[in-house]
Design a protein with these regions (language model features):
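Alpha-helical subdomain
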Residues: 2-78, 172, 177-342
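Conserved Class I S-adenosyl-L-methionine-dependent methyltransferase catalytic core
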Residues: 4-8, 14-46, 54-55, 61-176
């Protein structure tokens, strides 16, 4: 007869595990609320549960379930029996907002199956991107060709908020032309020229993406100061600029490719020129924080790259020849790593 298992009062509770586990439903709930335009409905006026359910043709129970998740993460609040939007939702979840985040949900809906446990397991065992990301022509190549606009809008959603903050965290007074390498929609160029009136920007990306960047520049009223330059950032020379910006570019690539970017910028910039890398950074031990660790899993499934620590990116810039290297938290989970060419 086997010995009885001894049990004791646990030393710690299991809340962190439940937080991860319940995230399986949290993201889809917010996505469905977004898809059903529940938040847009509440932008018109505060409404009660029954009014919301009736307006969207929902039974009370599912309407309440979605609203509860949205309220729990701070998108809506309940006062006097009526739900209304919080500043978080007004800033990021309404299409009319210049810092709209909803395109991230829309684009990831197209490839949501890629982030299944099976897909992640395959990525872990093979150390290779999965699904639509496994194209031999490069990460995202075939999917990107078909869904370039979707992806560009998604990256714009992720970038435009922090783009309105980081240019205030670093001295750009002496700089006149910013090269936005792999700049996508040009969100960071838009933010930089809006906040720094003496600055102009060039978005360097593939030709179809440059066309979209031009549309965004028009939309934000900065087309006279944000231009585009269709090019391959590996093969083609960089146009003249005294400020190089890389927003979510380094994390797409392994260290040797990132070192290539750092050296290419060092060789291209004039003395006094500056490089700025904009990423979510690991701590120096690469053990957190959790959002960055989770983002790193995204990179594992999607690209050959990874999230980096401030120590790793600083070392890359130093090895390339940059000096006056600084790391500055900017907005939310974002930071910049910056250096100057002597």
């Amino acid at each position: 007869m086997e010995k009885a298992v001894k049990i004791r009062v646990p030393h710690v509770d299991e809340r962190p595990l439940w937080d991860v586990f319940f995230g399986v439903w949290g993201y889809p709930a917010v996505f469905v609320a977004h898809e059903l335009k529940l938040l847009e409905l509440l932008s018109e006026k505060p409404l009660g549960l029954e009014e919301i359910a009736a307006a969207k043709g929902l039974a009370r129970r599912p309407a309440e379930a979605l609203l509860a998740v949205c309220a729990s993460i701070g998108l809506i609040r309940l006062r006097g029996g009526r739900f209304s939007l919080t500043p978080l939702a007004q800033e990021y979840m309404l299409p009319s907002s210049p810092t709209y985040f909803g395109w991230m949900f829309d684009a990831w809906r197209l490839i949501y199956s890629v982030w299944s446990p099976d897909s992640l397991r395959d990525a872990v065992l093979s150390n290779k991107p999965q699904g639509v990301f496994s194209d031999p022509a490069g990460p995202f190549a075939s999917w990107h060709a078909e869904h370039a606009a979707d992806f560009t809008r998604a990256m714009h959603s992720a970038s435009i908020g922090p783009a309105m903050v980081w240019p205030l965290k670093v001295d750009l007074a002496k700089h006149r032309v910013m090269l936005d390498v792999g700049g996508g929609s040009g969100a960071h160029s838009i933010g930089a020229v809006m906040l720094r009136p003496k600055l102009k920007a060039i978005v360097l990306d593939q030709a179809p993406i440059c066309a979209l960047a031009g549309e965004f520049a028009e939309k934000y009223g900065v087309a006279d100061r944000v231009s585009t330059h269709p090019a391959d950032f590996f093969e083609d020379p960089y146009p003249e600029a005294d400020l190089h910006f890389y927003g979510m570019i380094f994390h797409d690539w392994p260290p040797e490719r990132c070192q290539f970017f750092a050296r290419k910028s060092f060789d291209s910039l004039p003395p006094g020129g500056r490089i700025v890398i904009h990423e979510m950074l690991f701590n120096d031990n690469r053990t957190g924080p959790f959002p960055v660790a989770a983002f790193n899993v995204d990179m594992l499934v999607a690209v050959p790259g990874q999230q980096y620590s401030k120590r790793e990116l600083s070392a890359m810039l130093k090895d390339a020849g940059f000096r006056k290297i600084e790391v500055k938290p900017t907005f939310g989970y974002w930071s910049i790593v910056t250096g100057v060419k002597p």
